[in-house]
Amino acid sequence: MTDGRTERAKAAREQRELQILEAALQVFAARGYHGTSVSDLVDAAGVARGTFYLYFDSKQAVFLALLERLLVAMRGAVLGVDTRAGAAPLTDQVVAILRAFLTTAAGSRALTTIVFREAVVLDQAVQERVREHEGAFLAWISGSLRNGVALGLLRPHDPDLAAVLIYGAVRHVLERCLDDHTTAADIDRLARGMVDHHLHGLLPPVTA
């Protein structure tokens, strides 16, 4: 068993780490990734440089920690579709999933903006982590589409190609959600519009 002092020390360490991360997020948002130095992070967090290095060994390590928090939250927003009898209509479920994903990303607007708009100039380790996330997301979309075909919910198609097209659309829709004036109603409209476009296309419905 751990004693009270150990628990308090652990809590204090977690609080200090969170303090550094929250301060770093504001600095990255204001200066961008490459415009930020360790000195900027130390000053913003209000800690000694030695204290900073007890938690993170570089600016990159801080950004990767922030990135991981964002990716975990985004993955948590993406749920599977319920195909049981009595479940909500497929379209409504997909809209809810996309809306939750966009809302989560927009809720971390500063970090999401850096990741998606500065991705090509970020450090290699950061780029690799973003690519891993993109690869996992593409695989999830493709797998979901395959399941949809197998269950008769979707027509036969190339799920890998469709996944690339859907992910590209998600990224561009996400860009729209990063505007400071984007509201929950805007996100809902974007989610519904994108789902309608991908599931139903632009042609009028075929009538018998």
Residue ranges of predicted features:
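Amphipathic alpha-helical packing segments from all-alpha helical-bundle domains
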Residues: 72-79, 104, 124-150, 160-164, ...
